[in-house]
């Protein structure tokens, strides 16, 4: 076994690898850029080596710099994590030449699976189900149209190299096939330096389901169930779960056996993932193989008890697998939510800045681990478990140079419904301030009827949120629970407010019992009867709720029980009440006496400023160019200007027809969020 491993990555995955290496008694080396000098993975590692400026192409993916760090520290092996150099065969080759072990598959497997045309041909030869298509090189648009007609519309036009949604077009007719071929070819050449294109049948309403495989260098291979990854936006996964709510045991076994057959066909030896698309009739088709550890690997670990990072390290050290297919048991259900630094109310634009508050929910164990083919620890209890894989800390910076993922929040429970409920509570308990984040959106997904039923495809977000995420309106049942909680909390706050220093407990000024709770445009008249154990909140329709809590004024997180069911609220003080965030909703909750509530209804509502005739900057960024001038008439959808943020260019377009009256910014200007870029007549 190795004595020292270098992790050629950063963020949460570097921290994840360090945890397992530490458990195995292996010392670790971190690498870091200027931007990551104080990063969590640097603090956790036994050693750390500086490798350059913040941009990844000047630090983390420069092979020579990583190799220099390996030589300087004497690391015997390198774990690449995911992204960066994890699927770079030249990096694996450089390590081999240096006599350093790559904790991943052989170079040949990386190359074979990294090319979509080659990988599909190998899959067909290994009797793996593939999407019908043409695997030869397509010379021009006319040939693309001919092949598309032979396959039958709709078709997917794809670049052979690369990924991430680039060089991909769906065509529903000849014209779209002709245009899509040229666009995909251009994008592929610009993005990957390789303009080879192939065409395959497009599966409508597909699910994205992947199989986790684990192979060694002794010819052994197993699969560890599947992961459902259908909830995506812009080809980026947001929510994953294991197992899939859609598959039956026969389909799972067939997919698993084909995934292992493909891995063995390329001499695979490590953890890897074979991705499939699955239609509504449970027909499945090979999509691609990721020759690395997946971001979403924790859900597999939670339902199998297998530490995938440990297995990767043991396989890399030449050990045979200690686990057989018969040892693998899928126990319970696990769900992962990816917490991103982004603003869900502004089209999920990235957010940067300092984490002024970062308090994840407490982590709890999910049951036994499978070690050397034997289960270690107690059998899973009926209680839910929480896991949070992260690479940040309170006071740390979210940088513009890297992926905006803050954490991967996972829950495990005996059933899917219990895992979802555990995730709802965990999301409500997760405190993040200082930056924009997608916690409200994740909460909304967990409460969405289609997700709850398991009836979702890769089009879920596009179909259910066609206008983008606009926040959450709680149903009346939840509003009443929040109203009862707010009334009970207000009573506690009033007792504190009216207490005189030095006065004995239970001798405070009497606090009223009748209040009106106003939230989300609704009034709830209530009466509170308090005792030593909590409060009974009665509504004017005769119903009542029992509220218990140890919340005290000033606490930013309230854990309550309302009629025996948990309710977690993020709490802030506002005049006459609270700002409460729960289940994805952001509520202003006012608690008033009946007379105050009566007068409040007569007060004119303060309207927000009218910005309908302004173009506001949606994120901190740099104006790259302005495409219009004063006096120019613009049409809906017309490009107005381009802003660069987090190394990505974002085109801002006109929301409606109008005439430009004033332009307040020019190319080269740095702007803050909501700065007025231009105004219209």
UniProtKB/Swiss-Prot annotation:
One GO term (biological process): lipid catabolic process
Domain Biotin carboxylation per the UniProt entry, residue ranges: 1-466
Cofactor note: Binds 2 magnesium or manganese ions per subunit.
Binding site for Mg(2+) 2: 288, 290
Chain sites annotated for binding Mn(2+) 2: 288, 290
Function of the protein: This is one of the 2 subunits of the biotin-dependent propionyl-CoA carboxylase (PCC), the enzyme catalyzing the carboxylation of propionyl-CoA/propanoyl-CoA to D-methylmalonyl-CoA/(S)-methylmalonyl-CoA. Within the holoenzyme, the alpha subunit catalyzes the ATP-dependent carboxylation of the biotin carried by the biotin carboxyl carrier (BCC) domain, while the beta subunit then tranfers the carboxyl group from carboxylated biotin to propionyl-CoA.
Protein name per its UniProtKB record: Propionyl-CoA carboxylase alpha chain
Gene name linked to the record: pccA
């Amino acid at each position: 076994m190795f004595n020292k491993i270098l992790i050629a990555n950063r963020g949460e995955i570097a921290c994840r690898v360090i945890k397992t290496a530490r458990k195995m008694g292996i010392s670790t080396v971190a690498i870091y850029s200027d931007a990551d000098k104080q990063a969590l993975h640097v603090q956790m590692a036994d050693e750390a080596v500086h490798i350059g400026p913040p941009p990844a192409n000047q630090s983390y993916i420069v092979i020579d710099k990583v190799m220099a760090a390996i030589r300087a520290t004497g690391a015997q092996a390198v774990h690449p994590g995911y992204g960066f150099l994890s699927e770079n065969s030249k990096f694996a080759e450089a390590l081999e030449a240096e006599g350093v072990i790559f904790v991943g598959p052989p170079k040949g497997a990386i190359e074979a699976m990294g090319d979509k045309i080659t990988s599909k041909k190998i899959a067909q030869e290994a009797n793996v189900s593939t999407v019908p298509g043409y695997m030869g090189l397509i010379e021009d648009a006319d040939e693309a149209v001919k092949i598309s007609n032979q396959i039958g519309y709709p078709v997917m036009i794809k670049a052979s190299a690369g990924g991430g949604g680039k060089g991909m077009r769906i065509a529903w007719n000849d014209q779209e096939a002709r245009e899509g071929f040229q666009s995909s070819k251009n994008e592929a050449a610009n993005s990957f330096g390789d303009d080879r294109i192939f065409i395959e049948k497009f599966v409508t309403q597909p699910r994205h389901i992947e199989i986790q495989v684990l192979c060694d260098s002794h010819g052994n291979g197993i699969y560890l169930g599947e992961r459902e990854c259908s909830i995506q936006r812009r080809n980026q996964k947001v929510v994953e779960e294991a197992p899939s709510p859609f598959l039956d045991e026969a389909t799972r076994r067939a997919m698993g056996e084909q995934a292992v057959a493909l891995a063995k066909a390329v001499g695979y030896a490590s953890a890897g993932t074979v991705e499939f698309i699955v239609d509504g009739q449970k027909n499945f088709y090979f999509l691609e193989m990721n020759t690395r550890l997946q971001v979403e690997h924790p859900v597999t670990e939670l339902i199998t008890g297998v530490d995938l990072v440990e297995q990767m390290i043991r396989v890399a050290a030449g050990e045979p697998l200690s686990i057989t297919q018969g040892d693998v048991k899928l126990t319970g259900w696990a769900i992962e939510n990816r917490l991103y630094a982004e603003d869900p109310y502004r089209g999920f634009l990235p957010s940067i800045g300092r984490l002024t508050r970062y308090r994840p929910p407490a982590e709890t164990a999910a049951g036994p681990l499978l070690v050397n083919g034997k289960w270690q620890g107690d059998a899973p209890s009926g209680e839910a478990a929480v896991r949070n894989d992260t690479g940040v800390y309170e006071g740390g910076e979210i940088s513009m140079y890297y992926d905006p993922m803050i954490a991967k929040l996972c829950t495990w429970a005996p059933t899917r419904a219990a895992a979802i409920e555990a995730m709802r509570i965990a999301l409500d308990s997760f405190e993040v301030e200082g930056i924009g984040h997608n916690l409200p959106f994740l909460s909304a997904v967990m409460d969405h009827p289609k997700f709850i039923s398991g009836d979702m495809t890769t089009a879920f977000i596009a179909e259910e949120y066609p206008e983008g995420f606009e926040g959450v309106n709680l149903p009346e049942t939840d509003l009443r629970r929040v109203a009862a909680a707010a009334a009970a909390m207000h009573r506690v706050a009033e007792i504190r407010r009216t207490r005189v220093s030095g006065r004995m407990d239970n001798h405070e000024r009497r606090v009223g019992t009748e209040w009106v709770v106003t939230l989300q445009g609704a009034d709830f008249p209530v009466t509170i009867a308090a005792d030593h154990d909590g409060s009974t909140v009665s509504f004017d329709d005769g119903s009542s709720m029992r509220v218990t809590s140890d919340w005290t004024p000033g606490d930013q997180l309230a854990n309550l029980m309302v009629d025996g069911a948990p309710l977690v609220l993020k709490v802030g003080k506002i005049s006459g009440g609270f700002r409460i965030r729960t289940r994805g909703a952001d509520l202003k909750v006012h608690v008033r006496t009946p007379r105050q509530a009566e007068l409040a209804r007569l007060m004119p509502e303060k309207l927000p400023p009218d910005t309908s005739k302004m173009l506001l900057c949606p994120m901190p960024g740099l104006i790259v160019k302005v495409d219009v001038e004063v006096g120019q008439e613009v049409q809906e959808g017309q490009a107005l200007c381009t802003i660069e943020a987090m190394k990505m260019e974002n085109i801002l377009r006109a929301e409606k027809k109008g005439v430009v009256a004033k332009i307040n910014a020019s190319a080269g200007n740095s702007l803050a969020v909501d700065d007025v870029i231009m105004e219209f007549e």
